[in-house]
Amino acid sequence: MADTPVPIFNLAALREGADQEKFRECVTGMGVFYLTGYGAGDKDHRLATDTAMDFFANGTEAEKAAVTTDVPTMRRGYSALEAESTAQVTRTGSYTDYSMSFSMGISGNVFPSPEFERVWTEYFDKLYAAAQETARLVLTASGGYDAEIVGSLDELLDADPVLRLRYFPEVPEHRSAEHEPRRMAPHYDLSIITFIHQTPCANGFVSLQAEIGGELVSLPVVEDAVVVMCGAMAPLATQGALPAPRHHVRSPGAGMREGSDRTSSVFFLRPTTDFSFSVAKARSYGLAVDLDMETATFGDWIGTNYVTMHAKNEPQAG
């Protein structure tokens, strides 16, 4: 069992009403937990990951260009190493995300091959069903969800999700912790909840950390479990009852560079783009909404972030 203070829950047990008080305290206090028994197994994760990794390693430049979107407000298809910068969005720097990725959603997808599409669509559907059920449990447990204010849960969870597979290669010397402490800047997700399935670094280094109770807590790989993180839409949907924990991906030190590569399969359960919220309330919940309007939509917010995220600087040589 991994050494972590973050609780582990089982979806079937939660469905049957077990651990309700512990679950409520966890989601309203931490906003992050591990989940087992959610319907996707190791075989599912491995097949989807291997399919993307084969494309990352063997796809030609022309093949990658064919599935790279030129629409900056969309997360679809291939995104090259260091093509994005979470730090630019969060205004914490200009360094790039040291990762490459492939993304898909409900529609507007681009795939390298029919087989890639088949594998990923089956994987997407399993994670979508699990995320919807989990989000329903999380929002209900919070005690802050009010259908008269937000609308029905069914409508909220009939969502606009995104699946993104990130590959974090071994870092070059100029991206080791001594030079740049993070592979990916601190941020909270623009989602209701997020599923994160990780593969461990071969050398044992733990990259993913979340801020819990004012301290950074490592989130190691737990066998047969995903990390579930409340995103920024969670406090907006529960009148602030749920937090949206900031998290980041650490860089290894120079002595831990070898064997530090890892993958992260991330499923963002996002509301539809017309989900509206009060900008003032969002700011009162600690969310950095940089929009000059009283009422904004999810589409307004995420569109601005995606444009800002695309790295303006050329990747550093190293």
Swiss-Prot record:
PROSITE patterns: FE2OG_OXY (PS51471). Gene3D superfamilies: B-lactam Antibiotic, Isopenicillin N Synthase, Chain. InterPro entries: IPNS-like_FE2OG_OXY, IPNS-like_sf, Iron_ascorbate_oxido_reductase, Oxoglu/Fe-dep_dioxygenase_dom. Its cofactor is Fe cation. It is an enzyme of class 1 (oxidoreductase). GO terms for molecular function: deacetoxycephalosporin-C hydroxylase activity; L-ascorbic acid binding. Residues 158-271 form the Fe2OG dioxygenase domain. Keywords: Antibiotic biosynthesis, Iron, Oxidoreductase, Vitamin C. Pfam families: 2OG-FeII_Oxy. One of its GO terms (biological process) is antibiotic biosynthetic process. Pathway: Antibiotic biosynthesis; cephalosporin C biosynthesis. The keyword Oxidoreductase applies. Its EC number is 1.14.11.26. It catalyses: deacetoxycephalosporin C + 2-oxoglutarate + O2 = deacetylcephalosporin C + succinate + CO2. The keyword Oxidoreductase applies. Monomer. Belongs to the iron/ascorbate-dependent oxidoreductase family. Hydroxylation of desacetoxicephalosporin C in 3'position to form deacetylcephalosporin C. This is Deacetoxycephalosporin C hydroxylase. The gene is cefF.
